[in-house]
Amino acid sequence: MELDHEYRPRIHFTPAKNWMNDPNGLVWHKGEYHLFFQHNPQGRQWGHMSWGHAVSKDLLTWEELPVAIAEDDEGTIFSGSAISDGEDLVAFYTRHTETNQSQCIARSKDNGRTFVKYESNPVLDENKKDFRDPKVFKYK
């Protein structure tokens, strides 16, 4: 889809439609930069938070991909981070409910095109309403 609109940013990524906030999880993996962001795939207002996904080879030209990590019956998907373990992309994100936020993991074995949530999620749960945005990085 060609986006040519007077009020759209020319350098910063924006999705083709609907709500976006909190870019997170920028990571280089197998020849591509992966940008994840909070995204409401259902509308232009805040809600139904999932992780949107875009890729770029030069950080200027972006290709929007389908939602990387979607909300489910266990909660919506808030910000976090992502790392490359050399083979796979691993995402660390916040699962949000009305009463609790916890930290979860999802893994992609196909260069970020699909993610599978870890079956033992949450991996960190302090039973708190405001406990979000895990920052994870790989150290040699």
Task: Tell what function each PLM region has.
Residues 1-140:
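Beta-rich carbohydrate-recognition and catalytic domains
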